[in-house]
Amino acid sequence: IFFSRDSRPGDYQWPNNTNRLLPWVFSRLEDLTRSDYEGIPSNALPSVSGDALLFELSDGEYLFAKAIAGDNSLSWFQVNQDGTITLYISTLGEDALNGQLPLLLIRKSSSVYHVFSDAYHSLTADNAAVPTLRKRTDKQYFDAFNYLGWCTWEHYHFDIDETKILNDIDAIESSGIPVRYILIDDGHIANKNRQLTSLVPDKKRFPNGWMRIMNRKQADKIRWIGLWYSLSGYWLGISADNDFPPEIRQTLYAYNGSLLPGTSTDKIEAWYEYHIRTMKEYGFDFLKIDNQSFTLPLYMGGTQVIRQAKDCNLALEHQTHRLQMGLMNCMAQNVLNMD
């Protein structure tokens, strides 16, 4: 089994833009490169660049091999048309690879279940090597996710506004269905050419900001309200034409047509502290942070690419925890986000 994303023509490939990580079954590796490989009808073929491999060996044992990330390096597999496989490691930018770097995690077991658990337990057990990785059983969901919720995306996609949401809250409450949280999922962001311009929502769609919607929270009805955002601003980063205060603008730098948090860890932390604190002050209880694996192509080609992209994830986790905000991580299925 080869683990990679589904491939779409003209789209970014691994290690970027990984919305989901899928198991692609093969008898021979070149099967994955064939045009008649039975993929997913909606998105066609597997990406030939990916995260991990699982082999059933001739002696009945299983071998699991997984690409891993370092402080400023990233590895990944590529399946070639001749049935060979290449393991790459790169900084994805101007920096050279230096010193001793993590490259690959390998485990073997007679059980297909144990080979996975042994591999990940070895990572979580090494706090010095991977201090931020924890087992799912050691994590707690935000309280709201123990209840039934409603997400605007499934009904409206981008076509939302204050009136629609308020009307739907009325409908939910009158229905008697025990919905206890709602998620406002995209369609609200102030942007210019898909770059973030403000943390104030689109004024045409939400003329009163979030106040009227937040006033609808009740302990025995809709108790929590969450909001969608993208990790790096909006889909294509942060616009130079923004309304952020001067001290926040100083945490951003211009690169490849957009502004990005960085370059130092402190500046990245300051940007996410401002971002999360603003959402908390608006009254939101949790955030869905999307587009996480697309952070890499925004930084790619520069310096300290992996480190900065990883710092964005770490700062997001740190600030949501510190400010007691719930968090959904979305489009985060690549080596950097998972490890």
Residue ranges and their predicted role:
Residues 130-164, 168-171, 179, 186-190:
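An acidic-aromatic substrate-binding cleft motif
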